[in-house]
């Protein structure tokens, strides 16, 4: 049987990425052009700046991905692209590039949900056993997803307000940390102690929804009150206390979901899945199911994960026409026309 090659494009936020996947899960290349330095001074992603950067580098990323993979366009079997959720301008740049490439080379177009990409990045670690449960944690999303079979997703719990990654960045900004703040808070937390009493919203309630706005507000209020009184707070202890509250919430809801949905596999994915504290707590507290976490290089936004999700859609022949539009608020579901 001939090898199958998929070119994947990801541009939903502030990373321009293009990857080439051979067959089901052999990533031959995964080019990532990060914009972090451009957004640091703003303390967050500026949509217009992100879009302009995507325009500047997406064509070069495609060229580099093919070159690193050691193949030419004529060997490709399909082109995959993130069509949501994300920043509409950023999505449109990647989609325009992917659609133009697909049209020019007569290739079918595979639309991929960005969050499905995060989840399916776990396929590179091992073959996933279905049904499974996934905890997806990133800058824009915090959700528990039940996956009955490949490509069939159902949200069973999600945040009512801030995503967990968003909360990290906001408290990091208050402390004067560099954007994005997640890694630095995690490192500082390992040097501090959980001495500040932050709220764990809805942790004892039976539903599977999350809330981080109260925790974020409590943190900001404590920090501002200390500043006004001239009190000195220990940054390491602040980070340790904040992270302990976040992880208590995530673990409590995940355990409830595992009780409600008996599965053998838990996938934990998204940018926040790179958090060392989260990985440690998962290893300590969830031992009765197989916990699968993508490697660090596939936790943040990248086209490799989009290609891994696209392979499943390609198997099902879920292709889109070239009039496919960006869906910045795309709901997590199966294939959407």
Curated annotation (Swiss-Prot):
<dbReference type="GO" id="GO:0002949">
    <property type="term" value="P:tRNA threonylcarbamoyladenosine modification"/>
</dbReference>
<keyword id="KW-0808">Transferase</keyword>
<feature type="binding site">
    <location>
        <position position="301"/>
    </location>
    <ligand>
        <name>Fe cation</name>
    </ligand>
</feature>
<feature type="binding site">
    <location>
        <position position="186"/>
    </location>
    <ligand>
        <name>substrate</name>
    </ligand>
</feature>
<protein>
    <recommendedName>
        <fullName>tRNA N6-adenosine threonylcarbamoyltransferase</fullName>
        <ecNumber>2.3.1.234</ecNumber>
    </recommendedName>
</protein>
<comment type="similarity">
    <text>Belongs to the KAE1 / TsaD family.</text>
</comment>
<dbReference type="InterPro" id="IPR043129">
    <property type="entry name" value="ATPase_NBD"/>
</dbReference>
<feature type="binding site">
    <location>
        <position position="275"/>
    </location>
    <ligand>
        <name>substrate</name>
    </ligand>
</feature>
<dbReference type="GO" id="GO:0005506">
    <property type="term" value="F:iron ion binding"/>
</dbReference>
<feature type="binding site">
    <location>
        <position position="118"/>
    </location>
    <ligand>
        <name>Fe cation</name>
    </ligand>
</feature>
<keyword id="KW-0819">tRNA processing</keyword>
<keyword id="KW-0012">Acyltransferase</keyword>
<dbReference type="InterPro" id="IPR017861">
    <property type="entry name" value="KAE1/TsaD"/>
</dbReference>
<feature type="binding site">
    <location>
        <position position="114"/>
    </location>
    <ligand>
        <name>Fe cation</name>
    </ligand>
</feature>
<comment type="function">
    <text>Required for the formation of a threonylcarbamoyl group on adenosine at position 37 (t(6)A37) in tRNAs that read codons beginning with adenine. Is involved in the transfer of the threonylcarbamoyl moiety of threonylcarbamoyl-AMP (TC-AMP) to the N6 group of A37, together with TsaE and TsaB. TsaD likely plays a direct catalytic role in this reaction.</text>
</comment>
<feature type="binding site">
    <location>
        <position position="182"/>
    </location>
    <ligand>
        <name>substrate</name>
    </ligand>
</feature>
<dbReference type="Pfam" id="PF00814">
    <property type="entry name" value="TsaD"/>
</dbReference>
<dbReference type="GO" id="GO:0005737">
    <property type="term" value="C:cytoplasm"/>
</dbReference>
<keyword id="KW-0479">Metal-binding</keyword>
<dbReference type="InterPro" id="IPR022450">
    <property type="entry name" value="TsaD"/>
</dbReference>
<feature type="binding site">
    <location>
        <begin position="136"/>
        <end position="140"/>
    </location>
    <ligand>
        <name>substrate</name>
    </ligand>
</feature>
<dbReference type="GO" id="GO:0061711">
    <property type="term" value="F:N(6)-L-threonylcarbamoyladenine synthase activity"/>
</dbReference>
<feature type="binding site">
    <location>
        <position position="169"/>
    </location>
    <ligand>
        <name>substrate</name>
    </ligand>
</feature>
<keyword id="KW-0963">Cytoplasm</keyword>
<dbReference type="InterPro" id="IPR017860">
    <property type="entry name" value="Peptidase_M22_CS"/>
</dbReference>
<dbReference type="InterPro" id="IPR000905">
    <property type="entry name" value="Gcp-like_dom"/>
</dbReference>
<keyword id="KW-0408">Iron</keyword>
């Amino acid at each position: 049987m001939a090898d199958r090659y998929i070119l994947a494009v990801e541009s939903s936020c502030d990373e321009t990425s293009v990857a080439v996947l051979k067959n089901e899960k052999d990533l031959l290349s995964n080019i990532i052009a990060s914009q972090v330095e451009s957004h640091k001074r703003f303390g967050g992603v500026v949509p217009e700046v992100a879009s302009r950067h995507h325009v500047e580098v997406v064509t070069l990323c495609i060229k580099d991905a093919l070159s690193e993979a050691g193949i030419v366009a004529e060997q490709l079997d399909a082109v995959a692209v993130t069509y949501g959720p994300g920043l509409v301008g950023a999505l449109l740049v990647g989609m325009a590039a992917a659609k133009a490439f697909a049209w020019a080379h007569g290739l079918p177009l595979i639309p991929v949900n960005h969050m499905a990409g995060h989840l399916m990045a776990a396929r590179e670690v091992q073959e996933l056993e279905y049904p499974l449960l996934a905890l997806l944690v990133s800058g824009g999303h915090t959700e528990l997803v039940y996956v009955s079979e490949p490509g069939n997703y159902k949200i069973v719990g999600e945040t009512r307000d801030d995503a967990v990654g968003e909360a990290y960045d906001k408290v990091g900004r208050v402390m004067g940390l560099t954007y994005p703040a997640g890694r630095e808070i995690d490192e500082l937390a390992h040097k501090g102690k959980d001495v500040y009493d932050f709220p764990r919203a809805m942790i004892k309630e039976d539903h599977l929804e999350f809330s981080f706005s109260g925790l974020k507000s409590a943190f900001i209020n404590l920090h501002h009150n200390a500043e006004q009184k001239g009190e000195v707070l220990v940054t390491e202890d602040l980070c340790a206390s904040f992270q302990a509250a976040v992880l208590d919430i995530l673990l409590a809801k995940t355990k409830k979901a595992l009780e409600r949905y008996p599965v053998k596999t838990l996938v934990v994915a998204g940018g926040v899945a790179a958090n060392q504290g989260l990985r440690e707590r998962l290893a300590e507290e969830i031992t009765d199911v197989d916990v699968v976490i993508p490697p660090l290089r596939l936790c943040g936004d990248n086209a490799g994960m989009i290609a891994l999700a696209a392979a499943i859609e390609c198997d099902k022949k879920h292709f889109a026409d070239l009039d496919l539009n960006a869906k910045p608020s795309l709901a997590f579901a199966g294939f959407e026309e």
